[in-house]
Amino acid sequence: MSEKKLNQEEFLKILMHAHEIGEQSSEMTTKEMLENLISHIKNGYAT
C-alpha cells in the first residue's frame, strides 16, 4: 500500500480552495469548513 505525499503546491491549492469557499459562504460553520478541508486533503493522498 503506497501513500502519496502532497507537495506544497497541491496543499496550497487545497487551502486556497477552502479559503474561497469560506469567503463565499456566511452559512458554513468552522466545523464544516474543517471537515471540507480534511476531505480535500484525504483526496489528495488518495489520488
Curated annotation (Swiss-Prot):
It comes from the Bacteria. This is Uncharacterized protein YwzD. It comes from Bacillus subtilis (strain 168). The gene is ywzD.
